[in-house]
Amino acid sequence: TNSGDEGDNDLNQNMYTVMSYVDITSGQNPMLPQSYGFCKGPMAFDIATMQYLYGLNPSFNNGNNTYTITDVNQTGTGFSCIYDTNGEDLIIYNGSKKVNIDLRPANIQNNTGGGGYVSKVDDQTVYIGYTISNGTIIENATGGTNDDTFHQIESVENILDGNNGIDNVIYSDDFSN
């Protein structure tokens, strides 16, 4: 395959694994500076591989953690995969743009959601966000002041705070762990 081939279900991109040569932002903006918009560490497939080879790390991010979505491209900002093992956790956005917060973890299958679902502001010029690793549960989400969309799993008791705007909640029974 060529270096721009995103593979089956578009899973061959660095949004889902650092081992990919396909930069998630290159198709959207080939002139994007290399100082932001990249994956910042191991992504869903990388984390699943490490867990398979070395076992789970039950004490990693085991407290109450907050993951903040921002809407300004800055040096060092990009995409991360959340690996969190315990606690009451929150994904939050404190801005005025529309935001999509997806609480579904990666299902590590060759299908949509295999590498995770992206939580980010609804702006094609902002290259910052999160996916959630397989087996990780994020309990809560808080949106911004605009019309937000939340994706949640029916079997998880989430607390969703939409703040202002006309917000949507999409329920899924897709909890493939």
How should these model regions be labeled?
Residues 1-13, 22-25, 29-45, 68-84, ...:
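Acidic, glycine-rich calcium-binding repeat modules characteristic of RTX/beta-roll
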